[in-house]
Every structure is written in structure tokens, then in C-alpha cells.
Amino acid sequence: MNETAWLDRVFSNTSLGHRLLDRLTLTNLRHAFYLISPYETTVESIDDVPNYNAEVSAWWLVFLTAEFFILFISGHEDRFALNDSITSICAGMLSQCFKFGGRAVAIFLYVIVWDNWRILELPWDSPWTWIFCLFFQDFMYYLGHRAVHEAGFFWGLHTIHHSSEYYNFSTALRQAAIQDAGLAIYDCIQAFFIPPSIFLVHRYFSEIFQFIMHTSLVDTMGPLGLVFNTPSHHRVHHGRNPYCIDKNYGGVFIIWDKMFNTFEAERHDDPPIYGLVTNENTFNQIYLQFHALWDILIFKGFTKDVKGEPMFPGVVNKLKATVFPPGWFPGVPVTPFFHWMSMVNPAHGVPEPEKPVLRYSPPARILVKVYVASSFLLLLAIFFHFEYDRNHLSYLDCTVKIAYFVVTMQCFGAFFDMKWYARYIEIARCCGVLIYYGVLMFDHIGAGTHRLFVISLHIMAIALWTTDVLVEKLSQCCSKNQSINPEKGDLERAPEIASISKNVQ
């Protein structure tokens, strides 16, 4: 008897269920905590390095679900929100879309440097090379992470990760789509002596390890926190309290922060309040991804004070505004660090968070919440298929699917921001999907069951929002007609109503 027959019934016409369950292994669980050895992860070629992000993704779903359940039953439902979590996970999907084969763009630059300019060729099969890379790459991560906070427009490559006003596992996935471009220099420094395959292994696991740092469920971890990064240390990093600003950059190890005086312990009498010093107040994915970079490069240098005077007078100050720390203004002391300038006092000008904390969360109808949550699950399923199959897809297929992801995420943001046009762009999106699947009907697969299922869902979505719009318009017309044509009884009482209104005024 087929042991997975029940799975075939539950996940008919798709292999997604099998793919996820196949990855729920103890080995992948161990990988999620960076519990690996040189002997199981050392390979000669980068082509032999698995996509470890995809391997542990099933466990990430388990962690996310378990955390939400624990927070809910323990009375801490204020530590997560549907709109925030969906926005965060969508950001993670978008960041993966801009990586080739799941590997960071930096690996291609890395190989070029290694092939042409390496100074020393450490043996790829030596455990000592593996161990050296573990520490050296984490130090490079510290430098890169610090740079995207302090080195001017580099902050625009990282802002979205700190834009969440919550701190949970979904926040870990709130990644910038183009951050790898800013971190490439710190990756490529390793290419002068570390073999590409060893670099890539630790690159994967360094990123994977960051996921488990993003939770409020784990308190301090005692002696482990003296050497390793912990959720407590990283909570400080995400805080917008003055004492939290520009602290705790470490990835796996916290020792770099202690060496360079950027370490700060979590204060239980002043717990971190999460988000940005000035929060974004939107769930628009594209805006969250790119606006800070645009603002720093284009607008910051032309900022004026309340009197209308330029805050960055002269060309030099305007240029400094793009490369000096985000909180810098003329007269604020800075000091050089590596290739950028660092604030002498990172908390300069940072206000204390408001009390009580006010989070941006426009009240959405139950219909909107249920619809977006359901659409998100469909998007997530399509994305997992995309991640597993992307190496076999044509450039056209990849482009179309990425466009689908982006437009769908924008629709989610419009619904969560309660934009008047949300329903209209959702109807247009669904029509676009129907046109796409209509074209696919003419290929060799034809009208497959899974295609008909997706088409049916989008037809129902169009009907739902078209009906919703028509009902609203009809209601508005009725209200308008009622105000223009009042009932006879109201006309008879008009003098009395006018008299009351006059007295009130």
C-alpha cells in the first residue's frame, strides 16, 4: 500500500505537500540552529551546495505557526498582527525572488574575485578552513550589518527590516530585496583566500541562524549570551529606544560588538519598543522596500528646518547627507570606522518612544482580513513551487511569476492601508491572472485541474469585489436620494428643525 496515499488525496495535483513534509527532518531542524559540522557540509564546487534556505523553510513555517499559537494562548496577541506578519513574509518572498537559484547575487562576484585575484588558496577540504570561514565570515557580517545602519544611503538597503513594529519570527523574513548589493563588498573580501563553496555554506547558515533570533519568547540565555548572539541581544538591535540605536550588530557571535563597543544588554526596566525612530505607517511593499534609499539619496540634503532654512547648507554638506550616518546633521560629532563615519553618540536626537505605544494598524473589515489571509496562503503555495522549480523555469516564466508576486503584494498593502482603490486593483489583478491562464490553456498541458482551480478562485474573487463595489455604490445612491428627497413628515417639521439648528449654533 502507498504510504503517502492520504497525502495524494489532501494535496491532489500538487507535490507541495510532499516537498514540505520531506523537509521536516531532524537534520533540517538541526540546520535551522547552525548545528552542523565540516564533514557534512564541505564540498568542492558551489554547484554541490544545496539551497539550505529551501531545505529549512518547512521548519520556519512550523516555528511561525507555533509562535503565533503560543503568543495567542498566553495572552500576548499584542505581539503580532495579521497585516504586519503578512507584509513581513511577503518581503521575505520578494527578497528571494531577486536571488538567482536561491543564492545571493554576491556569489557571482565572489567567484570572479576568487578566479582572478585570490591571494591565498586555503584547502577546501580542510576542517580548519571551514572553522576559519565560520569566524571570519561572521566578522564580515558584523562589518556589513553595521555599514547598512551607519554608512549613509546603505541604510536605505536595510530600512524595511526594521520597519516592523512587532518582533516575532515573521520579522526575520522582512528582508530588503536589494540588500545583497550593499553587502557584496564584505562578501567578496573573503574571496581572496576562502574557497567559494565553503563561503556559500556559511553564507546560507549565517542567514538561516538569524531567523531564530527574532522572537520574544526566549529570555536571556545565561553564559551562551557572553559569546553568541541571542534573541535578547537582537531585540535590543531592533529597538527604537535611545539606548538601542546602532547596537548589537553581531550575527552568530556577539564578541564583535563587545570588541568595538557596540554591545548593549537588554533592559527589563526599559524593554525595547520596536520599529523605526519615525515609523512608516504603511503596508505598501514597494514603498517599504525602496523609499528610504530614495529619500537619503535625493531629498535628505535639501531638508529645511521649521524656519525654512536649509539643514544641509552647501554642496559638501549635501553630499555628506548621503554618506554620513542617517541621524547626522551638520555639527553632530562623528568618528571614522572602516570606510564610513560613525556617530559618536548614536542616540543623539533620538526621542523616547511614546507611551503608550501607538502602532499603525487601520481597522479592516472581517471580509478583507479573511480574503487577504486566504489569498496570502495561495500566494505562499505558488511561491514555494516557484522556489523549488525556479532553476527549471524559463526567463519568461520567472518574470511573469515575479510580476504576479509583486502585484499581489501591492494589493495586500492597499487593502491593509484601506486605500479606496484596493478593490479596483484587485479586480484588475484577478483579470490579469485569468488572461495569463487563458493563454496557458493552449500549451501542451491544457486545462489541468490545478489550473481550473486557480481560475475558479480568481473568478470568484472578481465576483466578490465587483458585488461589494456595486452594493456600496447603490447604498451611497440611496443615501443621497434620501437626503435630496426627504419624507413628507420631515418637510412638515422643517421650520422646527431649522429653529433647533439655529439655537445650537
Swiss-Prot record:
Top-rank lineage group of the source organism: Eukaryota
Chief place of localization: endoplasmic reticulum
Motif interval(s): Histidine box-3: 234-238
The entry's cellular-component GO terms read: endoplasmic reticulum; endoplasmic reticulum membrane
**What residue stretches are annotated with the Fatty acid hydroxylase domain?**
130-262
Q: Which InterPro entries match?
A: AGMP_C (IPR056853), Fatty_acid_hydroxylase (IPR006694), Sterol_desaturase/TMEM195 (IPR051689)
Q: Does the keyword Nucleotide-binding apply?
A: no
GO terms, molecular function:
glyceryl-ether monooxygenase activity; iron ion binding
Q: How does it sit in the membrane?
A: Multi-pass membrane protein
Location comes to: Endoplasmic reticulum membrane
Enzyme class comes to oxidoreductase
A Pfam family:
FA_hydroxylase
Stretches that traverse the bilayer: 56-76, 104-124, 366-386, 396-416, 430-450, 452-472
Alphabetically ordered keywords of this record: Endoplasmic reticulum, Iron, Membrane, Oxidoreductase, Transmembrane, Transmembrane helix
- What are the BP-aspect GO terms? lipid biosynthetic process; membrane lipid metabolic process
The reaction(s) annotated as catalysed by this protein in its Swiss-Prot or TrEMBL entry are:
1-O-(1,2-saturated-alkyl)-sn-glycerol + (6R)-L-erythro-5,6,7,8-tetrahydrobiopterin + O2 = a 1-(1-hydroxyalkyl)-sn-glycerol + (6R)-L-erythro-6,7-dihydrobiopterin + H2O
* Position of sequence motif Histidine box-1: 145-149
- E.C. code: 1.14.16.5
* Motif placement: Histidine box-2: 158-162
Q: Required co-factor?
A: Fe cation
Described purpose of this protein according to its UniProt entry: Glyceryl-ether monooxygenase that cleaves the O-alkyl bond of ether lipids.
The entry's family comment says: Belongs to the sterol desaturase family. TMEM195 subfamily.
- What protein is this chain from? Alkylglycerol monooxygenase
What is the organism field in this record? Caenorhabditis elegans
